[in-house]
Amino acid sequence: MKHLSIDLETFSATDLTKAGVYRYAEDPAFQILLFGYSIDGALARVIDLASGEQIPDEILAALTDAGVVKSAFNAAFERICLSAHLRRHHPDLLGEGFLDPAQWHCTMVWAASLGLPMSLDGVAKALRLDVQRSEEH
């Protein structure tokens, strides 16, 4: 595995827009509901953590593997949320720190550098993609 693409759906009792991602992810009610991923561009898979499914061990290992590039749209959000999740549920993998930002590529930044909008929906519309994010969160 050389590349891991990630997309999260999360919940927190803290308002992200008012408090920021760090306080959002540290809220006691914070949880990752869905963990979507693709390994090396293969078909995407979704883990339903809210229903009790678990992130596979190989994916957990890849999250802390410096040899695996992690990418996400708004990678800082995914990285901070995954760091909080790992500290709570897999402290042996991360301890008290955060996942290394040097191992992450942000597709939102790439999109912006190409003059595209800095929202996932905006990029999908600008590129006229058939598959767009649901308005229901």
Regions from the PLM with identified roles:
Residues T10, E136-H137:
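Intrinsic disorder/low-complexity segments enriched in polar/small residues
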Residues F30-I32, G36-Y37, G41-E58, T64-E136:
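Active-site-proximal helix-loop-helix substrate-binding element of RNase H-like nuclease domains
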Residues M1-F30:
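Entry/capping segment at the start of metal-dependent catalytic domains
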